[in-house]
């Protein structure tokens, strides 16, 4: 089985933690590094959350801090969903893990430039780190095998009626990425909201056990409450983890090729991913957009990753 080399760019975040847990353990993924961006909370908080998850699950992958601010817009955070720390719910031991001294953007550029074009970028937060890397060193563009991202929607947004949070948090960065010419796969809300983590799913992961089962339970029990209060959902979708699922087995997720453009005009559609689902513009598709996911397969995959953390000695 081919191992997909990836850099996971995230803003932990509850669903980000599940994505880290899966990417670090599944044999089909070679997780080279974790880069952190501001998003669900400010950078100082998302960095601590990423380090806490890695320490608890004994994930020995380097962690790099990146962009603390969006490229242009005023910063926003999703404390309504992720709480004051950005990862409210779990209680972690005192943190001893440290981030690398290299800036995430430099790490992304250097790693891609030294590669054979076989590295996939997996940004599951605002696209600030990726866009700055592209602008700073355009020679990385042909080196990127693919970008598999969580963000956007071809239907309704979740932070405004038009826009999904990750794109709305830095629309200008998203515009850079979506016009880059790099092969894109977009897991938007239309797909990710199909992964609502209901109490029975949480109970299943608790039964699977181990440190990852415990962490999954603590994380997703918190989002049960916030997702219901904010969106009336029966649980928290694990938005970001769908990207890892896609990389492990693309057949589990149905996609459609579309031309996607990010609206950067100020107005009610600021930050919208405008997806030409019907092809009315006649422009060539630049993105594979997630449509449906086989949820039975997906939760089986999550459980497989959770079980991977159980110590057998």
Curated annotation (Swiss-Prot):
Chain sites annotated for binding substrate? 227, 239
Give me the comment on cofactor binding. Binds 1 Ca(2+) ion per monomer.
UniProt-reported outcome of changing residue 239 to A: Increases KM for uridine 13-fold. No effect on kcat
Q: Where does Ca(2+) bind?
A: 11, 16, 124, 240
Q: Which InterPro entries would you find in this protein's record?
A: I/U_nuclsd_hydro_CS, Inosine/uridine_hydrolase_dom, IUNH, Pyrim_hydro_RihB, Ribo_hydro-like
MF terms (GO), sorted A to Z: calcium ion binding; identical protein binding; purine nucleosidase activity; uridine nucleosidase activity
Record keywords, A-Z: Calcium, Glycosidase, Hydrolase, Metal-binding
CC annotations in GO: cytosol; protein-containing complex
Broad EC category:
hydrolase
Name the SUPFAM superfamilies for this protein: Nucleoside hydrolase
Task: Tell me its cofactors.
Answer: Ca(2+)
Q: Name one GO biological process term.
A: protein homotetramerization
Q: Where is the active site?
A: 11
Question: Known catalysed reaction(s)?
Answer: a pyrimidine ribonucleoside + H2O = a pyrimidine nucleobase + D-ribose
**EC identifiers of the protein:** 3.2.2.8
Give the protein family. Belongs to the IUNH family. RihB subfamily.
Q: What does this protein do?
A: Hydrolyzes cytidine or uridine to ribose and cytosine or uracil, respectively. Has a clear preference for cytidine over uridine. Strictly specific for ribonucleosides. Has a low but significant activity for the purine nucleoside xanthosine.
NCBIfam families attached to this UniProt entry: PRK09955.1 (NF007417)
Q: How does it assemble?
A: Homotetramer.
**Protein name listed in UniProt:** Pyrimidine-specific ribonucleoside hydrolase RihB
Q: Which organism is it from?
A: Escherichia coli (strain K12)
Lineage of the organism: Bacteria, Pseudomonadati, Pseudomonadota, Gammaproteobacteria, Enterobacterales
- Gene for this protein? rihB
């Amino acid at each position: 089985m081919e191992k997909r080399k990836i850099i996971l760019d995230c803003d932990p975040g509850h669903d980000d933690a599940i994505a880290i847990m899966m990417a670090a353990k599944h044999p089909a993924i070679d997780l080279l590094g974790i880069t952190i961006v501001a998003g669900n909370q400010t950078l100082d908080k998302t960095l601590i959350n990423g380090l806490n998850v890695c320490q608890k699950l004994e994930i020995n992958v380097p962690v790099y801090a990146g962009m603390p601010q969006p490229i242009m817009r005023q910063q926003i955070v999703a404390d309504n969903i992720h709480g004051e720390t950005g990862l409210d719910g779990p209680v972690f031991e005192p943190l001893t893990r440290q981030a690398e001294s290299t800036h995430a953007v430099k790490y992304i550029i250097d790693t891609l430039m030294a590669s054979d074009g076989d590295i996939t970028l997996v940004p599951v937060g605002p696209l600030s780190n990726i866009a700055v890397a592209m602008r700073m060193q355009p020679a990385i563009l042909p080196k990127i095998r693919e970008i598999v991202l969580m963000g956007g929607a071809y239907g309704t947004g979740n932070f405004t009626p038009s826009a999904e949070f990750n794109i709305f948090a830095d629309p200008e960065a998203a515009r850079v990425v979506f016009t880059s010419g790099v092969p894109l796969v977009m897991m938007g809300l239309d797909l990710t909201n199909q992964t609502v983590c209901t109490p029975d799913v949480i109970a299943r992961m608790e039964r699977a056990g181990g440190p990852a089962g415990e962490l999954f339970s603590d994380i997703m029990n918190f989002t049960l409450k916030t997702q219901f209060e904010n969106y009336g959902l029966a649980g928290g979708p694990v938005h970001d983890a769908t990207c890892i699922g896609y990389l492990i087995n693309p057949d589990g997720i149905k996609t459609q090729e579309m031309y996607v453009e990010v609206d950067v005009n100020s107005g009610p559609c600021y930050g919208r991913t405008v997806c030409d689902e019907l092809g009315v513009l006649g422009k060539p598709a630049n993105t594979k957009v997630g449509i449906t996911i086989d949820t039975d397969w997906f939760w089986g995959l999550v459980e497989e990753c959770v079980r991977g953390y159980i110590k057998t000695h």
